Swiss-Prot record:
Residues 1-26 form the signal peptide. Glycans are attached at residues 31, 64, 122, 170, 314, 327, 356, 369, 398, 410, 430, 472, 551, 561. GO terms for cellular component: endosome; Golgi apparatus; plasma membrane; plasmodesma; side of membrane; trans-Golgi network. InterPro entries: COB_C (IPR056900), COBRA_pln (IPR006918). Expressed in roots, stems, leaves, flowers and siliques. It is a lipid-anchor; GPI-anchor. It is found in: Cell membrane. This is COBRA-like protein 7.
């Protein structure tokens, strides 16, 4: 009985000890298994599109050149869609800064259509390929493989030796409808930016139609799949000119097949080289063992397509395609709407794994050019809503293409590119002509082979020298410089080397108006059919009245109605090539020529200074190509009468020189 009171406290103490043990253990486990969460990454904090550029590796490559050492670089561009909607046709601009030459790029193409390797020292835009769209996390339940694009780059840069990192100056999302701040650097090798939707951009059409809207451009190309089978499809290619001064002569269209496709047949156009050897020696012949490859038109990875002559328009094999077969001529709509587009069809065979009716992929890296025409840069094909065509059966219905892509091309001026036409100025108050600039259309880069100066300014000319080829002008030019008491450089200035030149002559200036004379010279070997020229007048265009030998009118460009468009009248639309003189052994060759006087009124342009500059164009175009202009204007001298008398005294000397020539 005495032990009972001692037993109860001991039992109570033991119970408390047992209860306290698991409590202590539980608290300890909680502290060790639940560490504080790590901070979210920069991409997780972006509620838009996250773009990053990561330099991964660099190394020195030959040759050894301390002043201009090349290095290999490897980097990765990541585009991650953290927005609410799908990102259509993603494009990323990278502002390279170290004279980079891009050698390879995975999962992307260059949006300007350039083929690798290519210099990207001024920056370039990458476009997604073969997958150009990025789904959102909402659409994919967070599947990063559908939300993200990863582009691995390999190239060469100059001057940045490891361990230094050749990061670009900036990266940004170039897709329409997005706003990006300046990219920030993280660490030593990462440049990143978070782009958000532009609240002022209307993207309802994209959301409603699931296709990007068609865009405007100087020239658009539609790639429409009009028939599709498991192994091949029929594509219709339509080129349309939308620039009032744009034009193509003898167009040549090229592109890159990216998935081993080849062209079996064509209508409305033809490859510049017909060759199936690449298929016979490649995987195409192994897969299509029963196909007669002697009938294949082109197996080139980058074929060049040319237009057919008009004689093939009604040919059942090669023609019978609307708007085909015009020798590659595409005119502005203002000249002839029926000649402002060109169309052809081609049957394209596919290769595994694309052997099903819905596996359709357009070619990439489109490029188009012509002779004596503007230069175009074309973007990547963009998937748009299927095109509709009039039913060929004549029924009042439209047929829809299986799939459609649009390529937009715009006129550009390549760096260091030379014009292909030039302008000279003259006026009634000065008997000298301000000629085209020295080397206006380029000169040989081989200084040793030149017997002339590419830097000396061109010498003033007498009026009659305009009709004489440059190589026959020397005596006239030197004699004129002597009479005008002007120095003659040694060596003499080089010629302009232009196939086409245009003389703008200010003919009269009176109280109520003024006149000018335009003369177009063709010094080349090719006739120009349906030629046109255009002059931009900053202040005088509203006063234009008429051209007496040309069909001319004022047109608006970029919202300004200051350009006068001129073309040959019916029957006079040929600018013939240079031809032999009456006596080829004695007389110089004669250029093709078209000329007209233009009249202007001052009623709508009061206060203009015609001789001081308003009577001369600020820009001149021939067949869409912008021409080189002189840097000086004819001078109006108080000694004008004295100049006339000197000119009259010089006439016998000049006549003697012409007879000797």
């Amino acid at each position: 009985m005495d032990s009972a009171p001692n037993f109860i406290p001991r039992l109570l103490l033991l119970s408390l000890l047992i209860v306290s043990i698991p409590l202590t253990s539980s608290q300890s486990d909680a502290n060790t298994t639940n560490p504080s969460p790590s901070p979210p990454s920069d991409s997780d904090l972006c509620n838009g599109v996250f773009v990053s550029y990561t330099h991964t590796k660099g190394s020195k490559i030959p040759p050894n050149d301390t002043a201009n050492q090349p290095y290999r670089f490897e980097s990765v561009i990541t585009v991650l869609n953290h927005g609410r909607d799908e990102l259509k046709s993603w494009r990323v601009f990278v502002k390279f800064a170290h004279r980079e030459i891009l050698v390879s790029a995975s999962n992307a193409v260059l949006s300007d259509g350039s083929s690798l390797p290519v210099s990207v020292e001024n920056g370039t835009v990458f476009a997604g390929y073969p997958s150009s769209d990025l789904k959102s996390a909402i659409q994919t339940a967070g599947d990063v493989t559908q939300m993200q694009a990863r582009v691995e780059l390999v190239g060469t840069q100059f001057g940045v030796a490891p361990p230094n990192v050749p990061l670009p100056k900036n990266i940004t999302l170039a897709t329409d409808g997005w706003k990006c701040p300046k990219a920030t650097q993280k660490g030593t090798n990462v440049l990143q930016v978070c782009c958000i939707p532009d609240p002022d951009y209307d993207n309802r059409e994209i959301i409603d139609n699931e296709f990007l809207p068609r865009k405007d451009g100087d020239l658009t190309i539609m790639y429409d799949v009009v028939r599709s089978y498991s192994s091949n499809y029929m594509a219709q290619v339509t080129m349309e000119n939308h620039n009032p001064l744009g034009r193509l002569d003898n167009w040549k269209l090229s592109f890159d097949w990216m998935r081993d496709e080849f062209i079996y047949t064509m209508k409305g156009a033809y490859p510049s080289i017909v060759d199936s050897s690449d298929c016979v020696d490649g995987p195409q012949a192994k897969h299509y063992q029963d196909l007669d490859f002697s009938n294949v038109l082109s197996c080139a990875r980058r074929p060049t397509v040319i237009d057919l002559p008009p004689t093939k328009y009604n040919d059942s094999t090669f023609g019978l395609i609307p708007f085909c077969c015009r020798n590659g001529t595409i005119l502005p709509r203002s000249m002839d709407p029926s000649k402002s587009s060109s169309v052809f069809q081609m049957q394209v065979y596919k290769m595994p794994p694309d052997l099903n009716i819905s596996a359709l992929s357009p070619p990439q890296n489109w490029r188009i050019n012509g002779t004596l025409n503007p230069d175009y840069k074309c973007g990547p094909p963009v998937r748009v809503s299927p095109s509709q065509f009039v039913d060929p059966s004549g029924l009042p219905s439209n047929r829809t293409a299986f799939a459609s892509w649009q390529v937009v091309c715009n006129i550009t001026q390549p760096k260091d590119a030379s014009p292909r036409c030039c302008v000279s100025f003259s006026a009634y108050f000065n008997d000298s002509i301000v000629p085209c600039k020295t080397c206006a259309c380029g000169c040989s880069s081989n200084k040793a082979a030149r017997a002339c100066s590419a830097t000396a300014p061109s010498l003033l000319l007498p009026q009659q020298a305009l009709l004489v080829p440059f190589e026959n002008r020397t005596e006239l030019t030197v004699a004129w410089a002597y009479l005008k008491q002007r120095p003659v450089p040694n060596p003499m200035p080089c010629g302009d080397n232009c196939g086409v030149s245009i003389n703008w002559h200010l003919a009269t200036d009176y109280r109520g108006g003024w006149t000018a004379r335009v003369t177009v010279f063709n010094w080349g070997e090719t006739d120009f059919v349906d030629w046109f020229t255009a002059v931009q007048m900053k202040n005088a265009a509203p006063g234009f009245e008429k051209a007496y030998s040309f069909n001319a009118s004022t047109i608006g460009i970029n919202g300004k109605n200051n350009t006068i468009f001129m073309e040959g009248l019916p029957g006079l639309n040929y600018l013939v090539a240079e031809r032999d003189g009456e006596n080829p052994l004695k007389n110089p060759r004669i250029p093709g020529k078209q000329q007209s006087v233009m009249s202007f009124t001052k009623k709508l342009t009061p206060g203009i200074n015609v001789p001081g500059g308003d009577g001369f164009p600020s820009k001149v175009f021939f067949n869409g190509e912008e021409c080189s202009l002189p840097t000086i204007l004819p001078m109006r001298s108080s000694q004008h009468r004295k100049h006339i008398s000197v000119f009259l005294l010089a006439l016998p000397v000049l006549a003697l020189l012409i007879l000797r020539a």
